[in-house]
UniProtKB/Swiss-Prot annotation:
Known partners and oligomeric status: Homodimer.
Major subcellular location class: cytoplasm
Subcellular location: Cytoplasm
Source species taxonomy: Bacteria, Bacillati, Actinomycetota, Actinomycetes, Streptosporangiales
Protein name per its UniProtKB record: Proline--tRNA ligase
Organism: Thermobifida fusca (strain YX)
Gene3D superfamilies on file: Anticodon-binding domain, Bira Bifunctional Protein, Domain 2
Length: 582
């Protein structure tokens, strides 16, 4: 492959785009790899398309290695298949929905579990046909409310989605592990620093689920690791260790106190510590009750839900939404409070919730025998020593409180610390959610039907491109790993004398030896501009054909390390070939 910048469809930019927030967005646009078409929608230009296809090639190789077979299904999908599994409503506003001229409903596919299940159902009938793994690399669509960060969170994106079909759970476990190992090889080859974390399944359904997160401070996903073990989990999947229950006998009676002007935890704690109650109070002694409303998929009516968490914790809406998925969750508005006058803002307690049959879920730390300070359901009043299991009984527990550095690890080994990452892969053991919906059976060896079990596995191919840039760049530009770079070597002819002609000759010799070359043969462009573009574009090896040519030498630069060396023009082709081939 020989790309000549004199006729390459490429314009580099010196300034960051106005809407760019993260390095990958800035550099991919400045380098002419992508261009914004609409919010969350990007066009891939020649160099970007090459990088995208290089990532896809690595994914294909490793998927084929585990025996997966590539297919291509439509992106335009009929409503009825997604209605059969409930995802037409579960996905809510994130689905792109449309009608054809006859009024039939369609969607643009976010994932393809339904279609793959029906595809296999239409082709396979016997146990002898299984197991099978199918995959595709295709554009997906999600109507993100706030598309941001360039191609990191877009409305249209490239994704590899694969699906395994097995006769039993043991087979599913083997397929799941095969994918897990394939993903490890893929991300290792791509040079990414990543972590594998426990995750929730959300609208996908199923049981076991893990995410592959590229470690980056700009990532949208918060995950935790343990100081004492290899435990790692997405913050949404962290399970709070519950303390042991405590005896109730002998605990002080609950008493209501007049606590004027104390609608916040801070003001309440300050008041109590100056009220002469004979002990010191902290925010952790209080029980904060947060009101939300939930709505099941397809339902019109909202239901009230009370969430009780220790007062020194905030409610993490992502954790709350994950715990209640697939239901929709929203905070109460003025109209809601007006409709339910028993909800006294700033002073809500379990009493009014239970008296009015409002479901009440609490943090796992709220166990029988624990005493709390909480709202007395009356303005300017709180109750002290309200004991769980004696004075109130919650309807259950929920993971909704924020996770903090220093929290005990769920496995009992060490404490947690948080970091941020970019989700680049996700693997699910779906089980039989989709095969039940479409009655996907195989005729077993005994002549009886066997319900097939499924796995679902995704890699965000376009997001991987951005994740690589997030991890591999400097103040001058991108630093591509050789496996995905748009070229193996960037040859720069500085433009004086016969330097461009020699650069073109060396480039052709390299191409003849199987090296991918990007050559800057532009005339009328200063050496400084060419060097700046070479650093911005990030090809791992840069060859400068410049002033040293008069002495029979050229300069090799390593984009990552910055190392430079002079090489004889007569041996430079062999040197580069050996470098590229490792």
């Amino acid at each position: 492959m020989l790309l000549r910048m004199s006729n390459l469809f490429l314009r580099t930019l010196r300034e960051d785009p106005a809407d760019a927030e993260v390095p990958s967005h800035k550099l991919l646009v400045r380098g002419g790899f992508v261009r914004r078409t609409a919010p969350g929608v990007y066009s891939w230009l020649p160099l970007g398309k090459i990088v995208l296809e290089n990532v896809a090639a690595v994914v294909r190789e490793e998927m084929n290695r585990i025996g997966a077979q590539e297919v291509l299904l439509p992106a335009l999908l009929p409503r009825e298949y997604y209605e059969a599994t409930g995802r037409w409503t579960e996905y809510g506003d994130t689905l792109f929905r449309l009608k054809d001229r006859k009024g039939a409903d369609y969607l643009l596919g976010p994932t393809h579990e339904e279609l793959f299940t029906l595809l296999v159902k239409g082709e396979y009938t016997s146990y002898k046909d299984y197991p099978v793994i199918l995959y595709q690399i295709q554009e997906k669509f999600r109507d993100e409310a706030r598309p941001r960060a360039g191609i990191l969170r877009g409305r249209e994106f490239h994704m590899k989605d694969s699906y395994s079909f097995d006769l039993d759970d043991e087979g599913l476990q083997r397929s799941y592990e095969a994918h897990r190992q394939a993903y490890i090889r893929i991300f290792d080859r791509l040079g990414l620093e990543y972590v594998i974390v426990k995750a929730t399944s959300g609208a996908m359904g199923g049981s076991a689920s893990e995410e592959f997160l590229a470690i980056a401070p700009t990532g949208e996903d918060t995950f935790v690791r343990s100081t004492g073990s290899d435990y790692a989990a997405n913050v949404e999947a962290v399970v709070t260790p519950a303390p042991p229950e405590r005896p109730i006998d002998g605990l002080p009676e609950a008493r209501v106190h007049h606590t004027p002007n104390t609608p916040t935890i801070e003001s309440l704690v300050e008041f109590l510590n100056n009220a002469g109650l004979g002990r010191t109070f902290t925010a952790a002694d209080t029980l904060k009750n947060v009101m939300v409303k939930t709505r099941a998929p397809g339902e019109k009516e909202w239901e009230l839900l009370g969430i009780g968490v220790p007062g020194d914790r905030e409610v993490d809406m992502k954790r709350l939404e994950a715990s209640l998925a697939p239901a929709e969750v929203a905070l109460l508005d003025e109209e809601d409070f007006a409709k339910h006058p028993f909800l006294v803002r700033g002073y809500i307690g379990p009493g009014a919730l239970q008296a009015n049959k409002v479901r009440y879920l609490v943090d796992p730390r709220v166990v029988t025998g624990t005493a709390w300070v909480t709202g007395a359901d009356k303005a300017d009043h709180h109750v002290v020593d309200l004991v769980c299991g004696r004075d109130f009984t919650p309807d259950g527990t929920i993971e909704a409180a924020e996770v903090r550095d220093g929290d005990p690890a769920p496995d009992g080994k060490g404490t947690l610390y948080t970091a941020r990452g970019i989700e680049i892969g996700h693997v699910f053991q779906l089980g039989r959610k989709y095969t039940d919906a479409f009655s996907l059976d195989a005729l077993g060896p005994d002549g009886k039907p066997v319900r097939i079990t499924m796995g679902s596995y995704g890699i965000g191919v376009s997001r991987v491109v951005a994740a690589i840039v997030e991890q591999s760049h400097d103040e001058r530009g991108i630093i591509w790993p050789r496996e995905v770079a748009p070229a193996d070597v960037h040859v720069v002819g500085t433009g004086k004398g016969d330097q461009v002609e020699v650069a073109l000759r060396i480039s052709q010799e390299l191409v003849d030896r199987g090296v991918r070359v990007l050559v800057d043969d532009r005339k009328g462009v200063s050496p400084g501009v060419k060097f700046t573009d070479a650093e911005l574009l990030g090809v791992p090896t840069v060859l400068i054909v410049g002033r040293g040519l008069a002495n029979g030498v050229v300069e090799l630069r390593d984009r990552a390390s910055g190392d430079r060396s002079e090489v004889s023009v007569d041996t430079v082709v062999d040197t580069i070939v050996n470098l590229v081939r490792g």
